[in-house]
Amino acid sequence: MITLQRTPLFDVYAKYGGKTIDFGGWELPVQFSSIKEEHEAVRTAAGLFDVSHMGEVEVKGVDSLAFLQRVVTNDVSTLKVGGAQYTAMCYENGGTVDDLLIYKRGEEDYLLVINASNIEKDYEWLASHVIGDATVVNVSSEVAQLAIQGPKAEGILQKVVSEDLKEIKFFKFKKDILVDGIPALVSRTGYTGEDGFEIYCKSEDAAKLWEKLLEVGAEEGLKACGLGARDTLRFEATLPLYGQELSKDITPIEAGIGFAVKTNKEADFFGKATLKEQKENGAPRKLVGIEVIERGIPRTHYPVFIGEEKIGEVTSGTQSPTLKKSIGLALIDVKYAAVDTEVEIEIRNKRVKAVVVPTPFYKRSK
């Protein structure tokens, strides 16, 4: 029997009604109250997520920038201390190793935040391509991560932080902030389509911080949230999930994150030739939004057809709690990717009518 990994917060899940599942080898809460309630809390008030299963890798040294420029697609040279950047790592053929965040903590000090299911693979990939005076250290087990997301997230977090959180702009962060006396790195980032913060602290401090935030946020409607709501929220905001919208067989251009691929940067990064070609001449496939017109919910790997021709497949799909519609993301032949194109999805051996629609499905009002 495989032993599932647990985050430092595992022992407090039950107190808040957490129902756990096996998620990529981790025993994590899929929900606390209900996915719908948690989803709505984040869209209208605030939600608190345990994302300590995510991986953290430190890259340090004189050659850390040169090294990162070689292994990621975005231009890390534009990043200033106190800034965060979304990027991808690719194989030489343009397929995706992972998508990740890079935090620049110092001139020769970067923190990479990677997907839980890819920690070992990513670390080996990074370590095997190290150049010059750069070091790569996997610190995942030492670091916990909480995410507080939603329109009321700032007000709630401000109760336990003395620094003015308004000074932390989108994709910026402050390190060494005290959150209820606990040292943490606090960044205005997230995976929900809402405003909010991600808080990195030592593993041993996570449970205390979790309980404190839920206590001070109770009157504003802060709810403990699980993976179910995290997935429906990121899906509505059309944020890719590795293993679904991104994989070793799907390039960042196909997945719609071309903004994180800078083919004009000087460094010859892995996948550059393929990604440059796709940026300039178009990729063969495109990730599109689809709305099901008839009954049925599109799920991962369901085939998409026009007539008898299979043109692609669904990468993610759900009944959207916000839009009250059955929607999906699908990677399809670029010839059929225009909005309003009528397609069919095979749901349980039955063809169901659907239409290509614009994305993101949800965008918060500023």
From Swiss-Prot:
Give the keywords, sorted.
Aminotransferase, Transferase
**Any one Gene Ontology BP term:** glycine decarboxylation via glycine cleavage system
The residues forming the signal peptide are: none
Segments forming a coiled coil: none
Xref: Gene3D superfamilies? Aminomethyltransferase beta-barrel domains, Aminomethyltransferase fragment, Probable tRNA modification gtpase trme, domain 1
| Xref: Pfam families | GCV_T (PF01571), GCV_T_C (PF08669)
Q: Does the keyword Transferase apply?
A: yes
* Domain of life assignment: Bacteria
Which chemical reaction does it catalyze? N(6)-[(R)-S(8)-aminomethyldihydrolipoyl]-L-lysyl-[protein] + (6S)-5,6,7,8-tetrahydrofolate = N(6)-[(R)-dihydrolipoyl]-L-lysyl-[protein] + (6R)-5,10-methylene-5,6,7,8-tetrahydrofolate + NH4(+)
| One GO cellular component term | glycine cleavage complex
GO MF entries: aminomethyltransferase activity; transaminase activity
Enzyme Commission (EC) number = 2.1.2.10
Task: Give the matching PANTHER family.
Answer: AMINOMETHYLTRANSFERASE, AMINOMETHYLTRANSFERASE, MITOCHONDRIAL
Summarizing the function annotation, the protein's role is: The glycine cleavage system catalyzes the degradation of glycine.
Q: How does it assemble?
A: The glycine cleavage system is composed of four proteins: P, T, L and H.
Family, according to the entry, reads as follows: Belongs to the GcvT family.
What name does this protein carry? Answer: Aminomethyltransferase
The species is Bacillus cereus (strain B4264)
